[in-house]
Amino acid sequence: MTSHVMPTAERKVRVDLAERSYDILIGPGLIAAAGKEIASRLKGRKMAVITDENVAPRYLEPLMASLGESGIEAVSLILPAGEKTKSFEHLIPVCEAILGARIERNDAVIALGGGVIGDLTGFAAGIVRRGSRFIQIPTSLLAQVDSSVGGKTGINSAHGKNLIGVFHQPDLVLADTAALDTLSPREFRAGYAEVAKYGLIDKPEFFEWLEKNWQAVFAGGPARIEAIAVSCQAKADVVAADERENGRRALLNLGHTFGHALEAATDYDSKRLVHGEGVAIGMVLAHEFSARMNLASPDDARRVEAHLKTVGLPTRLADIPGALPPADRLMEAIAQDKKVKGGKLTFILTRGIGQSFVADDVPSSEVLSFLTEKHPR
């Protein structure tokens, strides 16, 4: 695979959005260097740090120390960990913490954690004072390569995932790759699903590279940094071209229409299914459905499933512990998805590995028939 970024120990990816452009820094030691990096970019010297009970014991103290060394005064709020934290119940305390810290125009809110903390904190920053500065310090692989980049923020609803939120771009993303060393194997695998997604969207050579080098990515070191940097560059390019998801950005949702429905069907119970696992199953289903519609070869679907299964990800509905609702109930969840326009189902389908496209008129009857075959119970 041809490298898409400079061959240095620390990588920098620029998200080009005119006056709202920002940097993504990728490499080890960035939490300890956060104060210096933030102080060099922002004039404000007051910060509110939002994190969760899993991340705080490891990284809150080093972050607060780094901020203090750079003359930044910070307060912190520690929330429960897990997908259910993305709710109105926890949004209000975050907003109050930001206001209580007297965060002003040049100050910032810092999200220290995975995708849940980033999405929730970004939403709060987007609505407090009609928009506060916001810094992402993602500590999970999924957050580093996906949710921390691009400005999508939000919380879940009883009607579905991420249905309440705003676009609010961060001012800086610090992806400390050393933080990934403390992830559980399951968490890392879940994030890897989003890495593989970029290859499946439009970078077949990257997917092939992952097939050959995934063990090195899991082990850490240069291959891991390379995979994260390529993923961030891929997302940055898409976001720069289509920030508000009016066209090309929708491709980033490959696997997510099925995946979000499965997350809702399991009541966001992380013991049964986490987001990246839902995406993995969703990407296999998207390739299988594309083959069913005679858009792609069944061999491509088998290849995608084989790779995701090799790294230890679930790839079939039967891999999800416990009972799932019937196919018609899954269809109801799909119909609530944000990728529905004019009552017509919009899916990201594929013509082959790295040849994904937006299909905005998918017959619901075909999807229901497909799901019934895959999940006859």
UniProtKB/Swiss-Prot annotation:
Its EC number is 4.2.3.4. Keywords: Amino-acid biosynthesis, Aromatic amino acid biosynthesis, Cobalt, Cytoplasm, Lyase, Metal-binding, NAD, Nucleotide-binding, Zinc. It is found in: Cytoplasm. Signal peptide: none annotated. Pfam families: DHQ_synthase, DHQS_C. The keyword ATP-binding does not apply. NAD(+) binds at G115, V116, I117, G118, D119, T139, S140, K152, K161. SUPFAM superfamilies: Dehydroquinate synthase-like (SSF56796). One of its GO terms (molecular function) is 3-dehydroquinate synthase activity. It catalyses: 7-phospho-2-dehydro-3-deoxy-D-arabino-heptonate = 3-dehydroquinate + phosphate. One of its GO terms (biological process) is amino acid biosynthetic process. Pathway: Metabolic intermediate biosynthesis; chorismate biosynthesis; chorismate from D-erythrose 4-phosphate and phosphoenolpyruvate: step 2/7. It comes from the Bacteria. CDD domains: DHQS. GO terms for cellular component: cytoplasm. InterPro entries: Dehydroquinate_synthase, DHQ_synth_AroB, DHQ_synth_fam, DHQS/DOIS_N, DHQS_C. Binds 1 divalent metal cation per subunit. Can use either Co(2+) or Zn(2+). Its cofactor is NAD(+); Co(2+); Zn(2+). Disulfide bonds: none annotated. PANTHER family: 3-DEHYDROQUINATE SYNTHASE, 3-DEHYDROQUINATE SYNTHASE, CHLOROPLASTIC. NCBIfam families: aroB. Belongs to the sugar phosphate cyclases superfamily. Dehydroquinate synthase family. Catalyzes the conversion of 3-deoxy-D-arabino-heptulosonate 7-phosphate (DAHP) to dehydroquinate (DHQ). This is 3-dehydroquinate synthase. It comes from Rhizobium meliloti (strain 1021) (Ensifer meliloti). The gene is aroB.
